Amino acid sequence: MEEFDSEDFSTSDEDEDYLPSGGEYSEDDVNELVKEDEVDGEEQAEKTKGKRRKAQGIPARKRKQSGLLLEEEEDGKEDSGGSSSEEDEEEQEGGLGSENARKKKEDELWASFLNDVGPKSKAAPGSQTKVAEETEEISSNKPLVKADELDKPRESEKVKITKVFDFAGEEVRVTKEVDAASKEAKSFLKQTEREKPQALVTSPATPLPAGSGIKRASGMSSLLGKIGAKKQKMSTLEKSKLDWESFKEEEGIGEELAIHNRGKEGYIERKAFLDRVDHRQFEIERDLRLSKMKP
């Protein structure tokens, strides 16, 4: 058995180291081997060519894509630039239009203000013409207003009134200033208007012949004249008050006396205060009596 095993191992080694010679291969085997080698070489060459083509094609496509992107971006920028320029022009036109409208509004407001107040040196030319026309109309209407004002006296105007009184057989004339719209001034004006026609009637223009009827007429007219010309009598108290008022006007102490009387030492103010106190006390007592009388 051992010999058999050693022989087997030797044969296996010999088989591995055995190389057949070229003469032992047939032509068909050689042709097949050559074809297989050619096919393998072609496949490897195609693989390497395909890899190179892939490597060369990727950056070209990328470049083409980047070129397209850049062109699109440039076109977009140009479009955006054109649109932005158009928008800027539109905004400028809109700004000019708004400024013009604002200026027109300011001019109109200024003109209306000038119409209410009067013409100014810095006014617009259109407003100046309007104001000039209005001033001309006002100046043309002024004389009519003045004529009306002259016919009717104002309320603030003062009118001097002279009254004649009889004091102990003496004629006393009193002059004072009152408002033109007061009752006293109106009555005085009416009285003067009545006295004017009477004076014209009583003064004879031509001498009349003597006669009984004429004498009676003249006697009656004289009596009526005496009755109409009867003077109002003045009492002693009124005369003393009149003298005191005239003295104050001559000396110019009216304001000083008024200030003095308003103070604590003034007799008139004290008397008025005491009168108010008495009146208030009377009202309180009356209210108490009425409250007790109620059931």
Curated annotation (Swiss-Prot):
Kindly state which keywords UniProt assigns to this record, in alphabetical order: Centromere, Chromosome, Developmental protein, Isopeptide bond, Kinetochore, Methylation, Phosphoprotein, Ubl conjugation
Cross-link Glycyl lysine isopeptide (Lys-Gly) (interchain with G-Cter in SUMO2): where in chain: 146
Q: Where in the cell is it found?
A: Chromosome, Centromere, Kinetochore
Basic residues bias (residue ranges) = 49-65
Q: Which residues carry this modification: N6-methyllysine?
A: 215
Which InterPro entries does the record associate with it?
BCNT-C (IPR011421), Swc5/CFDP1/2 (IPR027124)
Modified positions (Phosphoserine) in chain numbering: 80, 83-84, 112, 212, 246
Ranges in a coiled coil: none
Q: Which residues does the annotated region (Disordered) include? A: 1-153, 188-217
Q: Please state the protein's primary subcellular location.
A: nucleus
Write out the GO biological process terms.
cell adhesion; fibroblast apoptotic process; negative regulation of fibroblast apoptotic process; regulation of cell population proliferation; regulation of cell shape
Question: Mind telling me what this protein is named?
Answer: Craniofacial development protein 1
Purpose? May play a role during embryogenesis. May modulate tooth organogenesis since alterations of this protein function affect tooth organs size as well as individual cell fate and survival. In embryonic cells, blockage of the function results in increased number of apoptotic cells, reduced proliferation, alterations in cell shape and fibronection matrix synthesis.
Q: Which segments show compositional bias classed as Basic and acidic residues? A: 188-197
Expression by tissue, per the entry, reads: Expressed in lung, liver and heart, with higher expression in teeth.
Q: Keyword Cell cycle, does the record have it?
A: no
User: Would the keyword Phosphoprotein be found if you checked this record's keyword annotation?
Assistant: yes
Species lineage: Eukaryota, Metazoa, Chordata, Craniata, Vertebrata
Any Pfam family hit: BCNT
Residue stretches of biased makeup (Acidic residues): 1-18, 25-43
Region described as Hydrophilic: spans on this chain: 174-213
Gene Ontology cellular component?
A: basement membrane; kinetochore
